[in-house]
Amino acid sequence: MANVISISHFTLLALPYLLLLLSSTAAAINVTAVLSSFPNLSSFSNLLVSSGIAAELSGRNSLTLLAVPNSQFSSASLDLTRRLPPSALADLLRFHVLLQFLSDSDLRRIPPSGSAVTTLYEASGRTFFGSGSVNVTRDPASGSVTIGSPATKNVTVLKLLETKPPNITVLTVDSLIVPTGIDITASETLTPPPTSTSLSPPPAGINLTQILINGHNFNVALSLLVASGVITEFENDERGAGITVFVPTDSAFSDLPSNVNLQSLPAEQKAFVLKFHVLHSYYTLGSLESITNPVQPTLATEEMGAGSYTLNISRVNGSIVTINSGVVLAVVTQTAFDQNPVSVFGVSKVLLPKELFPKSGQPVATAPPQEISLSPESSSEQPSRLVSPPREIVSSGAVKRPLGFLVLWCWCIAFCYVLV
């Protein structure tokens, strides 16, 4: 009788999992490592790192980067990158990240009329009327590819520098592209250099009270924060890693069930609820979308111990960020403020910690809506809508699995079949 080679069910089940793990690991993008091979892109690479965009891209798995070589940085462009506030500079750089892998063949198929491609700036939630997209066109006679924005003249693609299907393509362009909504005349308030060797005082903190006043629909949250005194504590925590604040809108407080009365809570518990809305790290909206560890500690966690008062942050429907408190499921509805080291986001629900509000009471959690109305920053106009990025208009090789992965997958299936 022929010898039968046995193989455990665990091994059979583990092989597909390991292959999936390897494929997802390979899909992660390290844009700094990619650009390090090109010394002429050092200035652009440094901007991506210092602004935090390089880290933001690590969670993406398919994009095209529009990089400006050192030789193409005019004095005006360099001056612009130095003058812009950090949040505006970050949005400027997000506009140079196309959320679509474009191969050389994809570029050749672009029609003369052009194709709209979504940028990472669109995912920030601060764009309006399609201002987060660029129009990519190709001249059929010369073969040159240009990329346009309503706010500035078109830039020309100089070269397809690097392509790693289906993850990243690096295109060099002859100038920076400025998106609509960024004031190129804006500048940071620069302090003169000290005249003595004594240490200068630390910079003034960001005024959270004024941010919430400017947001127009955070009146209830503001009154609770001021009355409890924790808003001062939040402002003191801006230093170091920074903070991310999730502020319920006024309608979120109106939607609280009748058995939840925050005003009746003891002062200490009320402070815990408010601190439960704050992460002790600075996150942009894009970094929340690509967060690798969904369970995040809050300021309340620091007081009550590891594992308690945590939030579960995830992304659904492409670009909608949800926050699960263990009792309610809230959605990020707007970016009220984003300037390193502080970001403030409006949320659709009051985040109730399970430690204080067990689910045994009236159910509060609801499914996230298909579309979430967003209030524009500091505006009383009709809110725009945060939706998933539009479907890819240019056909892309990004939808195809890597050939090597398919061959490896088929080989493993055949190998297991022979062994069994």
Curated annotation (Swiss-Prot):
Sequence segments annotated as region (Disordered): 360-388
FAS1 domain segment(s): 29-177, 205-351
One record GO biological process: abscisic acid-activated signaling pathway
Record propeptide residues: 397-420
UniProt membrane topology term: Lipid-anchor; GPI-anchor
Coiled coil region boundaries: none
Membrane-spanning parts: none
Lipid sites, type GPI-anchor amidated serine: S396
Induction of the gene: Up-regulated by abscisic acid, cold and drought treatments, but not by high salt.
Primary location class: membrane
Signal peptide: 1-28
Cellular location(s): Cell membrane
Glycosylation sites: N30, N40, N135, N154, N167, N207, N312, N317
Cellular component, GO annotation: external side of plasma membrane; plasma membrane
Organs and tissues of expression: Expressed in all plant organs and tissues, including guard cells in the leaf.
Keywords, sorted A to Z: Cell membrane, Glycoprotein, GPI-anchor, Lipoprotein, Membrane, Proteoglycan, Repeat, Signal
Effect annotated for changing S348F: Alters the cell wall structure
GO terms assigned for molecular function: polysaccharide binding
Entry protein name: Fasciclin-like arabinogalactan protein 4
Originating organism: Arabidopsis thaliana
Lineage summary: Eukaryota, Viridiplantae, Streptophyta, Embryophyta, Tracheophyta
Gene name of this polypeptide: FLA4
